[in-house]
Amino acid sequence: MASCASIDIEDATQHLRDILKLDRPAGGSNVESQRPSSAYNGDLNGLLVPDPLSSGDGNSTSKPGIRTMPPINLQEKQVICLSGDDSSTCIGILAKEVEIVASSDSSISSKARGSNKVKIQPVAKYDWEQKYYYGNLIAVSNSFLAYAIRAANNGSAMVRVISVSTSERTLLKGFTGSVADLAFAHLNSPQLACLDEAGDLFVWRLALVKGKIQEEILVHIRQPEGTPLNHFRRIIWCPFIPEESEDCCEESSPTVALLHEDRAEVWDLDMLRSSHSTWPVDVSQIKQGFIVVKGHSTCLSEGALSPDGTVLATASHDGFVKFWQIYIEGQDEPRCLHEWKPHDGRPLSCLLFCDNHKKQDPEVPFWRFLITGADQNRELKMWCTVSWTCLQTIRFSPDIFSSVSVPPSLKVCLDLSAEYLILSDVQRKVLYVMELLQNQDEGRACFSSISEFLLTHPVLSFGIQVVSRCRLRHTEVLPAEEESDSLGTESSHGAGTLESAAGVLIKLFCVHTKALQDVQIRFQPQLNPDVVAPLSTHTAHEDFTFGESRPELGSEGLASAPHGSQPDLRRIVELPAPADFLSLSSETKPKLMTPDAFMTPTASLQQISASPSSSSSSSSSSSSSSSSSSSSSLTAVSAVSSSSAMDPSLPSRPPEELTLSPKLQLDGSLTISSSSSLQASPRSLLPGLLPGPADKLIPKGPGQVSSGTSALSLDLQEVEPLGLPQASPSRTRSPDVISSASTALSQDIPEIASEALSRGFGSSVPEGLIEPDSMASAASALHLLSPRPRQGPELSSQLGLDGGPGDGDRHSTPSLLEAALTQEVATSDSQVWPTAPDITRETCSTLTESPRNGLQEKHKSLAFHRPPYHLLQQHDSQDTSAEQSDHDDEVASLASASGGFGSKIPTPRLPAKDWKTKGSPRTSPKLKRKSKKDDGDSAVGSRLTEHQVVEPPEDWPALIWQQQRELAELWHNQEELLQRLCAQLEGLQSTVTDHVERALETRHEQEQRRLERALAEGQQRGGQLQEQLTQQLSQALSSAVAGRLERSIRDEIKKTVPPCVSRSLEPVAGQLSNSVATKLTAVEGSMKENISKLLKSKNLTDAIARAAADTLQGPMQAAYREAFQSVVLPAFEKSCQAMFQQINDSFRLGTQEYLQQLDSHMKSRKAREQEAREPVLAQLRGLVSTLQNATEQMAATVSSSVRAEVQHQLHVAVGSLQESILAQVQRIVKGEVSVALKEQQATVTSSIMQAMRSAAGTPVPSAHLDCQAQQAHILQLLQQGHLNQAFQQALTAADLNLVLYVCETVDPAQVFGQPPCPLSQPVLLSLIQQLASDLGTRSDLKLSYLEEAVMHLDHSDPITRDHMGSVMAQVRQKLFQFLQADPHNSLGKAARRLSLMLHGLVTPSLP
């Protein structure tokens, strides 16, 4: 945590006042509008208290399934600067517009370690590209885990599915492009839906069979061919709400919505599966089971389906959110119900409805609150869907001090209970957890805290598996510097102290840039101010209760309490308080003490629970008892005066208890009017009452104490403190928030504490615990709390409120405890609850009936040696107006704290809905305070006077002198106080009116609900009674009347009915016969006609034919099949068998006859051919012998002729080949020799020239050299590859022929074809000038060289720039003359092209 020196004092002070509910009216916005909004510096991270695990005692008024929201008045603006360490946990969000600045340690380049509250388990290694994915890369259920990857060989998209229990894996393939989104129907569902970039939908059912994952394709819908790939596609399942009667259900909703770029589609999967059995199916072939919604101008980004599937909400990049009424089964088009721009038209990226999907209360409507996000969720807004008003705005911004300020790109997800919103930044290695509170009745919802958890890599996508309550070990609660201090206390209390606090466990599966990881986060949430019952869990699990003896709690015992530990508060040091926190003099500098100063050990927890308390406790134990009145811890740290800041035993109090007693509230309203006025002038109210420095205060003598203060001191002594253990060492109270009359539940017995005890939220305090002696010991402890008391404006307002002249007015003023207890007795007269003891009555009876000498001596010593202002001093940092805090919430907080300890005497309990209206402080607390004050003035004055007479002080003159001096000061300040009182009362009228109206409305609503319940119960009881009476009456009547009635009715029927019936039926029978005959004739004719028409009708005949065909088809088919199988087939088989036998016999006989005839014919044919073959064979034998003789003769002749011819041809060929070889060799040798001789000549010539140059006194000009020698030398340079030297030597000779010799020898492509150009810029300029001097001869060669040389000029060279203009002008002139001389020359085109090039080069250089 950063140093406190960087905190702006005014801003930090204002924030602390807001946390402690100071300068904040309960119902009005007048004071809120007057107070300037101040930013909250992020260096105060960790001051808000986490919410422990609520065990619940049955008194909670919150509805199940909804996190109740305390009535918090949010500021206008707040800035939270995250620190990047484990102290950035549960940072309070206290404003309507909040800016959250990312920490520098969360950047990717940071070397900071990950959070200790995060446990990471690798699942799979894979490299994902770091970018913002609009869809989900991962889907999580209780049984399976699915994430999108790409194949290593071909890059095709796939989905890997892993079993959470067995780690078995499988792959799902068949996608087009990448996987745009994937999601399970719900956590207990095995149905996985995937959507690829082409818009194809896949729905699988996964199952684990014999240790292997089996996937079954349920739905596969393909988009048309050529659909463009788009990553703006999302899958939205209809939310699954489990029924209360079922524990777990794996059935999922059949409705799913698909968001495409320009439209949304809602599909009924059951209808699709009933109409199609094979997959895939083209979307064009589906005619029913889906509906298309269009209405956005740009691509859709998010959506949500209502639980009944009839309303679809869509968010788009055009900035609109629209709600559509949809009916899949009907023909109605989607109807837009509502639309609005939540973020002023910026692209939307988030749409979340805050519904509890774990257990939904039937009385709570869906879609009550809505979270929207824009600009990749850099801005989040909370909306009320009833009034469409923005309840809160959260903005995320980068660290302004970072070198690379990358804007956040956040992925958000809300857990099923709608209590925590989890965010990951794609650009940073961090996770944020924001706590969400809702109040359905008031229509309010807000983010109450944010926690930062550093990771090792950025999270690209994540899926929530579990968000649940857990118990944190002691080492998970305390910071690192406190763990060593807590080891001793842990060893003394055993292993039971290891689980020291309630926490939250969040299990995620996160896709990082390098791997897929199982992430578990354990942290302690923020304390919910309206339900403060952390000690109830302690009682339930460890049976930590008190007996009848009162325990004395020391700070050591409190330090070892295992509950409600909070991040370290010792990080904040030396934070001065503003002027309006305590009315101090300018010389008195307030100091902020660390919690270590308030942790002085006095007794261990075991000693506290075992040993009874004594009536005279020490100051440290008393302060510990007062500081342990509630289990909640401090929400902020503020300053205290120098007189009390140095006392480590001074108690403090949590913010839930900052409502003062009515008397002190009214008095305090005179001094602390508003934060703005007191900050401007801290001493403007009571300048006469502000003393000097604390070390210069004059000790008050006995003469300074009036009778009223003596009575007050005695009253304080008779209050017994009830010790309630503090939660943990980190819950040490703030030094300036000193426990007062409204701190300890029974120490002062204020109005709030009495109400909490009397209303019975927990176990009541035993009557034996409150005795006069114990109250006296508590008062002694209160006296010892302030070793250096000081005066304050509260004292003057307390003593001189009525403003009457004389001492009688001051003597008649009731004390703080009298006002509090008298009011409590009045408010609970009509109740049956046990009330707090009347300290005034007990004091009076003690003094008059049975005075105790020891008590009187103690009281005298305290009264005469202690200033009477010690109690009022404890209230100088609290809110002094009853309307400036929510009274009922504080009563509930105290009741929850007191209810955490068991008691042996049960107390009647009032229903949670009725206690607010019966004796509630909301029913005009000012009227009650005024009436109680007026009623108690005379009685208290008389008792005080009696006490004063009974025990007169010893130093009477000094007391009178001191009273006179104080009376003069009080009279001087009383006038100003009364004026301010009038102004304050006028300003408070509207606030009191609002309180009364709200109380009446609440009472009316409660009475209305109670009346409705009573009417319903009455109607139910009336119905039951009526049914019972009906049954009894029917039974009685049936038993009494049945026998008699049956006999009488039978006799009467026999006598009367037959004659009457016969007489009445005779005319009727005649009429019936006539009408029947008439009707029958008519019906007969009409039936004949209709039957004839019907028989002639084509439709009837067709119908009869179809019916007959349908009827006879089956029997006829069966008959034909039976007849064919039994009759036709056997007969056909027999006939075929006989036929094939006959055919076989005939074929065998015919074949035998044919073979016999063929044999005889072949024999005769053979004999005839043999007879004709004999002469032919003899003739052939003669011809063969003749041919053999001729062949031998011919072979000899041919071989001799061929040999002679071959010899002749070889002789001729060898002669010609010899001649050609000789000629070729001569030519080659001649060429080689000539070249060698030329080289030798050139070498000799060069040697001679070098010798001549060395012998001469001056260099010989190259112009006088022999042209042949120069050519030889140039040729040698060209052969050696020195082109630039060869051209330079030819150009230096100033001989155009020599230049042409070089140009002819070297090809232009060889010179200018190699980059860079080997010729220097001066050589190029000289070559251009000399070649252009005469274009009449060898024009083609010159033009080609000129064109190449001009193109290779370097215009950036200074030499070229200086001479290029003149040379180019000369060349252009020569080209012009060449064209004029011969316009029709074939080279004119090349010359004109070169002229145009030169014109472009020369023109810019001209002036």
Curated annotation (Swiss-Prot):
<feature type="modified residue" description="Phosphoserine">
    <location>
        <position position="3"/>
    </location>
</feature>
<dbReference type="InterPro" id="IPR001680">
    <property type="entry name" value="WD40_rpt"/>
</dbReference>
<feature type="modified residue" description="Phosphoserine">
    <location>
        <position position="730"/>
    </location>
</feature>
<feature type="region of interest" description="Disordered">
    <location>
        <begin position="787"/>
        <end position="817"/>
    </location>
</feature>
<feature type="modified residue" description="Phosphoserine">
    <location>
        <position position="734"/>
    </location>
</feature>
<keyword id="KW-0853">WD repeat</keyword>
<feature type="modified residue" description="Phosphoserine">
    <location>
        <position position="560"/>
    </location>
</feature>
<feature type="modified residue" description="Phosphoserine">
    <location>
        <position position="6"/>
    </location>
</feature>
<dbReference type="InterPro" id="IPR015943">
    <property type="entry name" value="WD40/YVTN_repeat-like_dom_sf"/>
</dbReference>
<feature type="modified residue" description="Phosphoserine">
    <location>
        <position position="583"/>
    </location>
</feature>
<feature type="modified residue" description="Phosphoserine">
    <location>
        <position position="713"/>
    </location>
</feature>
<feature type="modified residue" description="Phosphoserine">
    <location>
        <position position="850"/>
    </location>
</feature>
<feature type="repeat" description="WD 3">
    <location>
        <begin position="295"/>
        <end position="334"/>
    </location>
</feature>
<dbReference type="GO" id="GO:0000932">
    <property type="term" value="C:P-body"/>
</dbReference>
<feature type="modified residue" description="Phosphoserine">
    <location>
        <position position="898"/>
    </location>
</feature>
<keyword id="KW-0175">Coiled coil</keyword>
<feature type="region of interest" description="Disordered">
    <location>
        <begin position="547"/>
        <end position="566"/>
    </location>
</feature>
<keyword id="KW-0007">Acetylation</keyword>
<feature type="modified residue" description="Phosphoserine">
    <location>
        <position position="746"/>
    </location>
</feature>
<feature type="compositionally biased region" description="Polar residues">
    <location>
        <begin position="727"/>
        <end position="745"/>
    </location>
</feature>
<dbReference type="InterPro" id="IPR036322">
    <property type="entry name" value="WD40_repeat_dom_sf"/>
</dbReference>
<feature type="repeat" description="WD 1">
    <location>
        <begin position="174"/>
        <end position="214"/>
    </location>
</feature>
<dbReference type="Pfam" id="PF16529">
    <property type="entry name" value="Ge1_WD40"/>
</dbReference>
<dbReference type="InterPro" id="IPR032401">
    <property type="entry name" value="EDC4_WD40"/>
</dbReference>
<feature type="region of interest" description="Disordered">
    <location>
        <begin position="673"/>
        <end position="745"/>
    </location>
</feature>
<feature type="modified residue" description="Phosphoserine">
    <location>
        <position position="565"/>
    </location>
</feature>
<dbReference type="InterPro" id="IPR049404">
    <property type="entry name" value="EDC4_C"/>
</dbReference>
<dbReference type="GO" id="GO:0031087">
    <property type="term" value="P:deadenylation-independent decapping of nuclear-transcribed mRNA"/>
</dbReference>
<dbReference type="InterPro" id="IPR044938">
    <property type="entry name" value="EDC4_C_sf"/>
</dbReference>
<feature type="modified residue" description="N6-acetyllysine">
    <location>
        <position position="125"/>
    </location>
</feature>
<feature type="modified residue" description="Phosphothreonine">
    <location>
        <position position="732"/>
    </location>
</feature>
<feature type="coiled-coil region">
    <location>
        <begin position="972"/>
        <end position="1031"/>
    </location>
</feature>
<comment type="similarity">
    <text>Belongs to the WD repeat EDC4 family.</text>
</comment>
<feature type="region of interest" description="Disordered">
    <location>
        <begin position="875"/>
        <end position="951"/>
    </location>
</feature>
<feature type="modified residue" description="Phosphoserine">
    <location>
        <position position="893"/>
    </location>
</feature>
<comment type="function">
    <text>In the process of mRNA degradation, seems to play a role in mRNA decapping. Component of a complex containing DCP2 and DCP1A which functions in decapping of ARE-containing mRNAs. Promotes complex formation between DCP1A and DCP2. Enhances the catalytic activity of DCP2 (in vitro).</text>
</comment>
<feature type="compositionally biased region" description="Low complexity">
    <location>
        <begin position="609"/>
        <end position="632"/>
    </location>
</feature>
<feature type="modified residue" description="Phosphoserine">
    <location>
        <position position="728"/>
    </location>
</feature>
<feature type="modified residue" description="Phosphoserine">
    <location>
        <position position="896"/>
    </location>
</feature>
<feature type="modified residue" description="Phosphothreonine">
    <location>
        <position position="907"/>
    </location>
</feature>
<feature type="modified residue" description="Phosphoserine">
    <location>
        <position position="881"/>
    </location>
</feature>
<dbReference type="GO" id="GO:0005634">
    <property type="term" value="C:nucleus"/>
</dbReference>
